Amino acid sequence: MTSQKINISKIFPVFLTFIVMGFVDIVGVSTGYIQKDFELSDTLAQFIPFMVFIWFFVFSIPVGVLQDKIGKKRMMNIGLFVTLVGLLIPFIYYSFISVLIAFIGIGIGNTIVQVAANPLLQEVVSQKKLSSFLSLSQFVKAITSLLGPIVATFAALKYGDWKWVLIVYAVVTLLSILWLSTTKIEEKIKSEIPASFSSCMKLLTNKFVLAMVIAIFFIVGADVGMNSNIQGFLMKLHGYSLENASYGISIYFTALMISRFVGAILLQFLKPIFFLVSTTILALAGILLIIFSTTGIMAQVAIFIVGLGAGNLFPLIFSIAINGMPSRSNEISGLLVMAIVGGALVPPLMGVVSTSTGIIGSLIILALCFIFLLFIPFVKSND
């Protein structure tokens, strides 16, 4: 969209898809409950996020190529439907196998939603406002991520079943499908050349694009690793119960939500690269504070600080990459979403390290993910 005029009637249904996008974060609090229900080890439990996020690596580029042919809105509705099916499975039949199948469905659906969402938003807002609106969309997504652990914990305590949150999510997903389907969005931004697997992979020869892809890998890996291990941090470092530790996830997502709302405002004035470095340093400071925390309250404050720092990293990288090559947005979106596989690989690594060296080792893994981002300003495009 090149016009500065903003059509709210088109932005709202697109923003609702970002709420559905946030449903994938339920894997964090779900991991704790599933581990307890089926008496899983730390290492095995961390393969639940793996079953969600591995599909970003498998399907992102094919989805980007298909999206180039059938359109962003149609691709989005396919992703929403697959997500809906995945959300319903554990409520219908609950076993470890059915949970894995459900999260595979949620992962595949979310992959499609993520590939389609940012380019679709690009169609309804101006290029100049894209960075700000991407942060605002992530703020909307963070509302879901914040409420998920609260609803799941409430359902577990009140009704003895955390899975009621999945029914709530399924209803919202159905509403999103219906609203988007009845909203007319003219897709004007077209690829200069037809997208293909080879054209996507060729973009990786651009050092800047490659750096952006690696950055997304570490950002999402750190985010999912943080989300799915907050309960463990508070339980093992400070003796919290599972239910009380679950509220730590909501503290994290509250910080993400605040960070993204403030980021949407600040990015009207600040350069994205400067903001990227500043917030990365803040996230690193939070990780160090968790490591050296002496009380549960101190650890919770540190978790909040990590969330404040990490909140805008994903939309910043996405907007920098897409704004750099807007006519290749479908392919770039596919590559960047493929890198979300970091969410499948970093948590199991953290689980292995935690089992062998202790919980502090898993926090060091998170710190290393953030440290990579500090080198982004030194990478220049060879385009």
Feature map (PLM): residue ranges:
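Extracytoplasmic
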Residues: 9-40, 118, 226-231
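Extracytoplasmic gate region of multi-pass secondary transporters
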Residues: 27-28, 206-250
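Helix-breaking motifs and short loop linkers at transmembrane-helix boundaries and internal kinks
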Residues: 39, 71, 92-97, 293-294, ...
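Central cavity-lining transmembrane alpha-helices of secondary-active solute carriers
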Residues: 50-64, 250-262
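Conserved MFS/SLC helix-loop-helix module at the cytosolic interface between two early adjacent transmembrane helices
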Residues: 58-97
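Cytoplasmic helix-loop-helix junction between adjacent transmembrane helices
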Residues: 102-139
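Intracellular juxtamembrane helix-capping segments at the cytosolic ends
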Residues: 112-125, 311-326
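Helix-loop-helix hairpin linking two adjacent transmembrane segments in secondary transporters
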Residues: 133-185
